[in-house]
Curated annotation (Swiss-Prot):
Keyword Chloroplast: no
EC number from the UniProt entry: 2.7.7.60
Pathway stated in the Swiss-Prot or TrEMBL entry: Isoprenoid biosynthesis; isopentenyl diphosphate biosynthesis via DXP pathway; isopentenyl diphosphate from 1-deoxy-D-xylulose 5-phosphate: step 2/6
Enzyme class: transferase
UniProt catalytic activity: 2-C-methyl-D-erythritol 4-phosphate + CTP + H(+) = 4-CDP-2-C-methyl-D-erythritol + diphosphate
Highest taxon, organism lineage: Bacteria
PROSITE patterns in the cross-refs: ISPD
A GO term for molecular function: 2-C-methyl-D-erythritol 4-phosphate cytidylyltransferase activity
Function: Catalyzes the formation of 4-diphosphocytidyl-2-C-methyl-D-erythritol from CTP and 2-C-methyl-D-erythritol 4-phosphate (MEP).
Keyword NADP: no
Name of this chain's protein: 2-C-methyl-D-erythritol 4-phosphate cytidylyltransferase
PANTHER family: 2-C-METHYL-D-ERYTHRITOL 4-PHOSPHATE CYTIDYLYLTRANSFERASE, CHLOROPLASTIC (PTHR32125:SF4)
Amino acid sequence: MIDTLPAFWAVIPAAGVGARMAADRPKQYLELAGQTLLEHSLDCFLGHPALKGVVVSIAEDDPYWPGLRYASDPRIQCAAGGRERADSVLNALLVLHAQGAGDSDWVLVHDAARPNLARSDLDKLLSELADDPVGGLLAVPARDTLKRADSHGRVSATVDRSTIWQAYTPQMFRLGALHRALAECLVSDVVVTDEASAIEWSGQAPRLVEGRSDNIKVTRPEDLEWLRQRWAGKR
């Protein structure tokens, strides 16, 4: 690990609706320990000395963002949320370009509903990728036995988990490379579920940086309940 961490921009796509949560609002605005998941996710970055700024992609008709304490923070800019995650991230990168960010600047993209990022994991990612020619992402080696299912919901095969990792965020890439990769995927109608998959499609191999398994993304109600119990010291 290097002694000096590289400066970086953070991008948080926050325009999704989180349908699987079946909540009365988008999941990034659900509360955990007195503030929203989005605010917790922002907290992971705003106290970091290497941060240059943050762009949050927000849905056009979002009624919740203006009421957050970070809505008027000068370190945070907003971008228009898009139909898909890739659109939202690409719009955020355009905002960074407009602010004078260069193609060689590092950008870290983080899920709005992933509030439990440890500072040690963030520093590890920055340190290990500082001189990497491609960039990479936090990830966790698969622990459970993995099964491939057929169309009838029955096991068709057991997957060798020795080379399988779960992709987490932040995902860290150079602004120019990520912009080109996402733009090319959108033009080619390639579906990408994260930034690393866009970089992969462009022919590059992102590096996997092992992180903590408790850096979970809130996707279902039980995820939020687990975090509430953990943060309350009950787990």
